[in-house]
Design a protein with these regions (language model features):
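Short, acidic Ser/Thr/Gly-rich low-complexity loop/linker segments typical of extracellular
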Residues: 295-316, 620-637
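Short, internal strand/loop/helix patches
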Residues: 766-796
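Conserved small/polar residues in nucleotide/adenosyl-binding loops
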Residues: 798-805
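Short active-site neighborhood of thiol/selenol oxidoreductases, capturing the structured segment around
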Residues: 713-731
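Short, ordered, surface-exposed loop/turn motifs in non-cytosolic proteins
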Residues: 279-298, 320, 511, 603-627, ...
């Protein structure tokens, strides 16, 4: 008789050990957690301990035990009731089924709810089948919508019915994990062929990882709109929060999080070697090497390594250009080196470190061209659904869209209505009521979809006493407003107020800079126990006495506002400020901007920051881009006050094939100096702009509905296919121009194919007139539901799409 399975038998010891270490470091927080664990079953308690053992300190401070209990109970239930889940390797189960965090999202209870919603739809399915079905459910509930940088919880994406790709994938991963399908989010941190990034989902089955587009269901795995785009990536990564790292190439860490290289599943790759030497030509062991791609006109890191005893670092990457920089600190002095490497043609590169203080001299202050090559797309993931599968998928997707549109048509967050209607005590009722709409109005659109009435109520109640002490706009934006940065919106004012006596509160109001001194003494930063992009809330900082530098800055603003002091983080550089004598003053003395850079734009280029130019300062062996705010060129001149030091200006011209013509200008500026530089954008020749793009097969219809392959229509030579939206631009404009050049187009009419939705389109004035003038043009039909997107995305591999998203 087989022995009964033991839950997490292989990892039990290390889970207990790591949990005890966390509890030892945060005893005040873990005392009530331990009490609650004693009331759980042995399996649920162990699952909870795993979550607590490997979660960031921010999660420990931000969320109550009951949130994590939902994840633990659901995971244990799956393990007990689903043989497929019980058969998973423990590391796969722990990291990709049980674990609560996907990326940097808000954490909220969702797993049990999702399982009850989805469970009946996947009865009897294997992981592959279940993953496809779950993704249809996700498409029924949410779709893409461009939003701000704060990442919603999975349940909030479900409720509001949309999110950006990073939020769609957080939602889909949680849905998959809720029913036992191992899943994770993967990222192209920056594309090489266009200014953007993207996130999607991988699922584990049959011992391998497969991918799918979040909320973008297909009838097969390893298929998504981004399939070709991913074959042009220089890096695709996943992340793991556990300290026991799965097999794979580690490409960097973010505090407690380890990043893994997943590119081989998507693109043609090779291993490159970087050798770093010091000024004497000796190997530099322990140098930090950053591998970067040019994106949004700045060099953005996609992987980081440290050199070994031979001064070498190796990376598996795609076949394109990388900007590679290295830095090292010796006796308090930083050394730096950089180069551009085309990995398609080169296997190795060598960097020689020089003191960053000697990085620039007068002779080097000139524009230097750099050609940046994007990888070619390659047929790596070529599986395609059959015609029957596509037809089935289209039908299901249409139904999913209809369901979702009905769900979100008139949806609004009921918590907002509850907050607006709530009455406060009799004395303050009239005053508070007048500020309820103001409080909601000062929140972001995203905040209004997931805020909680009780949270807003505390902020209103404890801020109202200060409303008459300043201008209304100042009070609403910088005292009443619960939002400081991208932190989770929670209560904190009552928690803060009880920490100070009446005398202490008045002293802090009189000199708000003292708030920061108190924070520095009371709150410690443990970056090795955090993820930099996950913020500890003000109340969480107080509970755990820990927080990142950003979390502590947010805490400063929260304390100041709680005490009635108008405060904010500066929108340009996130520096702490409070209002004094009607203007914001910095809490920490800023480095003096003691010199001036005058940039000349010229007359032919429209310069847009982080689109075709940027400027970065060299500090601690690393260039950091300046976050310019509302600065604009006036009469082709931009005056930038700067701190003295070494800088690099980048300009970039993205070509249709994804390559870039870059220009770099390195310079040093001294205290008191005024320096003039004219921005230069490299121009492209016509031959640089042209590109042959291989298009996927697609079907069109004749007038009688017969389907015809596009390849058959173009078998006898080159053709122009024009998908026309009658009586809309740019169709109308193009048709009129064709008629103006009737003679030039007449000789090519037989090679021109107009694609329209219906016969009625042919009767519209401009189109019917064009057909009368340009005889022999062929007419075919399509409903524009799929082909347009497919072809458009294929072409977008070679152009810059819409604003950044993640």
């Amino acid at each position: 008789m087989a022995e009964p399975r033991v839950f997490l038998k292989e990892n039990r010891g290390r889970i207990e050990e790591n949990y005890l270490e966390q509890a030892k470091n945060l005893p005040r927080v873990f005392a009530p957690v331990d009490e609650k664990l004693q009331k759980c079953t042995e399996e649920v308690a162990l699952a909870c301990k795993y979550l607590y053992a490997f979660m960031p300190y921010s999660d420990i401070g931000n969320y109550p035990f009951e949130v994590f209990l939902d994840y633990a109970e659901n995971g244990v239930k799956l393990w007990k009731e689903n043989p497929q889940v019980a058969d998973l390797p423990e590391e796969i189960f722990l990291n990709y089924v049980l674990f609560h965090r996907v990326n940097e999202e808000e954490i909220a209870q969702c797993r049990t709810y999702f399982r009850t919603e989805i469970g009946s739809r996947i009865q009897g399915m294997n992981f592959r089948e279940a993953a496809l079905e779950v993704n249809y459910w996700c498409a029924e509930e949410a779709t893409y919508h461009c939003t701000d940088d704060r990442t919603l919880s999975a349940i909030s994406v479900y409720r509001r019915g949309n999110g950006r790709c990073g939020e769609e994938s957080v939602f889909t991963v949680n849905a998959l994990r809720s029913v036992g399908v191992p899943a994770r989010q993967v990222y192209a941190p920056k594309w090489s062929h266009c200014d953007d990034n993207h996130a999607w989902v991988e699922i584990w089955c049959d011992g391998k990882w497969y991918f799918l587009g979040a909320c973008e269901p297909e009838e097969i795995l390893n298929k998504g709109w981004f399939t070709n785009a991913s074959s042009r990536a220089m890096m695709i990564h996943s992340r793991v929060f556990d300290t026991k790292i799965p097999e794979g190439e580690v490409i960097g860490t973010d505090g407690m999080v380890t990043m893994l290289n997943e590119l081989k599943r998507y693109a043609v790759t090779k291993e490159i070697t970087v050798t770093v030497k010091d000024a004497q030509g000796l190997p530099s062991e322990g140098a930090e090497v950053s591998f970067e791609v040019l994106n949004y006109s700045e060099y953005a890191p996609i992987a980081e390594k440290k050199t070994d005893s031979k001064g070498t670092a190796r990376l598996t990457t795609g076949l394109g250009s990388l900007h590679i920089s290295a830095r090292m600190c010796s006796d308090g002095e930083w050394f730096y080196a950089e180069t551009v490497m085309n990995t398609e043609k080169e296997d190795n590169c060598e960097l020689c470190l020089v003191s960053q203080d000697k990085r620039n001299d007068g002779e080097s202050e000139k524009w230097t061209a750099a050609d940046i090559f994007a990888p070619h797309d390659a047929p790596v993931n070529t599986d395609m659904p059959t015609l029957e599968q596509k037809a089935k998928g289209n039908k299901r997707l249409t139904a999913a869209n209809a369901h979702r549109e009905q769900k979100v048509r008139n949806w609004s967050n009921p918590e907002c209505e509850r907050f607006l209607e709530k009455k406060v005590n009799r004395i303050e009722e009239a005053i508070a009521a007048s500020y309820r709409e103001d409080l909601l109005r000062v929140l972001t659109e995203k905040d209004r979809t997931d805020c909680i009435s009780d949270v807003l109520e505390e902020h209103l109640e404890l801020a109202i006493p200060y409303h008459s002490m300043m201008k209304k706009d100042t009070f609403v934006s910088y005292v009443l407003n619960p939002r400081v940065d991208d932190e989770v919106l929670q209560k904190y004012r009552r928690e803060i107020k009880k920490h100070f006596s009446r005398t202490e509160k008045q002293e802090l109001r009189d000199d708000p800079s003292r708030i920061w001194n108190l924070i520095e003494k009371a709150i410690v930063s443990r970056p090795e126990k955090e993820r930099s992009s996950v913020i500890t809330t003000p109340a969480g900082c107080i509970r755990t006495c820990t927080g990142s530098f950003l979390s502590k800055k947010i805490l400063f603003v929260a304390i100041a506002r709680t005490l009635g002091v108008a405060a904010r983080l500066n929108p340009h550089d996130r520096s702490m400020e409070y209002m004094k004598n009607g203007r914001f003053v910095p809490v920490l003395a800023r480095t003096e901007k003691n010199c001036t850079l005058i940039l000349k734009a010229g007359e032919t280029v429209q310069w847009k920051y982080f689109q075709n130019w940027s400027i970065a300062k060299l500090e601690n062996g690393r260039y950091t881009s300046l976050k310019l705010g509302a600065e604009n060129f006036e009469d082709q001149i931009l005056n930038l006050p700067l701190e003295s030091g070494n800088y690099r200006i980048l300009t970039s011209n993205r070509l249709p094939n994804g390559n870039m013509f870059a220009n770099e200008y390195h310079f040093e500026i001294q205290p008191g100096e005024t320096k003039e530089i004219e921005l230069v954008l490299r121009e492209a020749d016509l031959e640089d702009m042209l590109e042959n793009i291989s298009m996927p097969e697609f079907m069109l219809k004749t007038e009688d509905g017969t389907e015809v392959k596009a390849s058959d229509l173009t078998a006898d030579g080159k053709h122009i296919l024009m998908f026309l939206e009658e009586e809309k631009e740019p169709t109308e404009h193009i048709l009129n121009e064709m008629m103006e050049q009737e003679e030039a187009f007449a000789g090519y009419a037989e090679q021109i194919i107009f694609v329209v939705r219906s016969k009625e389109a042919l009767e519209t004035p401009t189109l019917s007139k064009a057909l009368a003038k340009l005889k022999n043009i062929q007419i075919y039909y399509d409903d524009f539901s799929e082909i347009i997107n497919t072809l458009g995305r294929r072409c977008l591999l070679y152009t810059s799409p819409s604003p950044r998203d993640s």
